[in-house]
């Protein structure tokens, strides 16, 4: 049986991946900082450690052997080195890292994996840190796979995005939307993402990076009106002319007003799972969860709403 370590397991992506792998019969350990309760069973061991404290990681990781490591919580090169400097490489077949589309130097359309990486003013330090973590991994001998997704949504999302629209529409409140530049974005449903991650274990390719998203192109109106259709209410949209206001769109909107779509031909050509859940289907499942759980969330950047 394959032995697997998931770095993460208590938040949105890590918990969804853990639940998927447990359901499929894999033997997994999870490593979290222990601050959040784990709401599922079936893992072999729960390792509790702050991965940013190097000595603690050395104590808990040294000598452990895994066939596959899924790293869902690596944000800096230090996060990576605190793991791979101590983990045993004896059995390791793949180190699978969740990076981000934010590593690309330019935001735009149809971005391919070979596009230049670098600092992007839209993503700031987050994207640059992810890029530096990638570079550290690529320059190491570890058998890596790097995943670069677009916007991830779904049940248990810890970012206040689709839930914000659900709340506004339910309450018949106006939704301010940036107007000016017409942009298109891509989204990937969490259920699709974890299937992509699982498929990596079964695929022969190694030391590769992949863009991961559903190829469907979505405008802000598409996103908001789809939410309204699912709820059964007409959204009330108030367009904000970006040329007539001095504040940036992130102060009143949960996304940056930029094009963000990636080319996934490499993913397809290499035989990995292809995301196929369209926006309406994924948001329908998400809203069902949202209605049952009513999470209380906010976005500190959205201070002009």
Residue map of PLM features:
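Amphipathic terminal alpha-helices
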Residues: 278-305
């Amino acid at each position: 049986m394959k032995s697997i370590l998931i770095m993460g397991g208590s938040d949105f992506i890590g918990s969804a991946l853990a639940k998927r792998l447990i359901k499929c019969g894999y033997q997994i350990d999870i490593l979290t900082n222990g601050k959040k309760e784990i709401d599922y069973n079936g893992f072999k061991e729960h390792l509790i450690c702050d991965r940013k404290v190097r000595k603690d990681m050395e104590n808990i990781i040294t000598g452990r052997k895994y066939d596959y490591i899924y790293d869902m919580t690596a944000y800096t090169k230090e996060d990576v080195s605190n793991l791979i400097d101590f983990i045993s490489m004896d059995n390791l077949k793949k180190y699978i890292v969740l990076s981000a589309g934010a590593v690309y130097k330019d935001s735009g359309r149809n971005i391919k994996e070979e596009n230049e990486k670098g600092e992007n003013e839209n993503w700031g330090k987050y994207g640059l840190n992810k890029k530096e973590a990638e570079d550290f991994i690529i320059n190491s001998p570890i058998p890596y796979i790097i995943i670069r997704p677009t916007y991830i949504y779904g049940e248990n999302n810890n970012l206040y995005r689709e839930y914000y629209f659900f709340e506004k529409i339910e309450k018949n409140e106006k939704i301010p939307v940036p107007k000016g530049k017409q942009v298109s974005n891509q989204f990937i449903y969490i259920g699709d993402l974890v299937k992509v991650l699982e498929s990596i274990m079964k695929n022969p390719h190694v030391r590769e990076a992949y863009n991961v998203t559903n190829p469907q192109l979505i405008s802000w109106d598409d996103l908001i009106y789809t939410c309204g259709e699912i709820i059964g209410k007409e959204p009330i949209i108030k367009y904000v002319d970006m040329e007539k206001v001095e504040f940036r769109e992130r102060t009143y909107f949960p996304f940056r007003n930029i094009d963000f779509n990636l080319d996934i031909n490499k993913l397809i050509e290499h035989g990995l799972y292809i995301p196929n859940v369209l926006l309406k289907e994924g948001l329908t499942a998400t809203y069902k969860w949202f209605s049952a759980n009513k999470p209380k969330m906010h976005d500190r950047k959205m201070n002009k709403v």
